[in-house]
């Protein structure tokens, strides 16, 4: 159902390979997951291959290469299994499904708003209630303050409430700001 929601919002599904040659899989942003990547030898080419530990770098590479000439903004969605050498405290499992969306070629704050809205709608579509999303993008909150016509004093109260994760303080804001934030 998640993929149906993102598809209905114009996100095209891409399916990166589960196994790739190491020089492709771990290039660019893929370097960040090198230590988490299972490796194996391809018996035909005698080259090292890796099982993806994160699909995001693969999708970024697809956007930059095969879809380099596609019109922007480019909206891509993906879902599939990933495998990591070891889990961590937050996610001890080594194999799990990853679902994501990427938006390339648009203003940062606008893209952030679209992605957050899409995530909220997708989670509601699968029955998640009382959703709380933590944002750490100063440009996004400033854009929200401007969009709802918030004066400087109210913007400062909103900023402090958000920093403190004070739901009552956010709810006490005037107008549309409380609903959006």
Where would I find each of the regions flagged by the language model?
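Extended, charged alpha-beta segments that form solvent-exposed binding/catalytic grooves
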Residues: 1-181
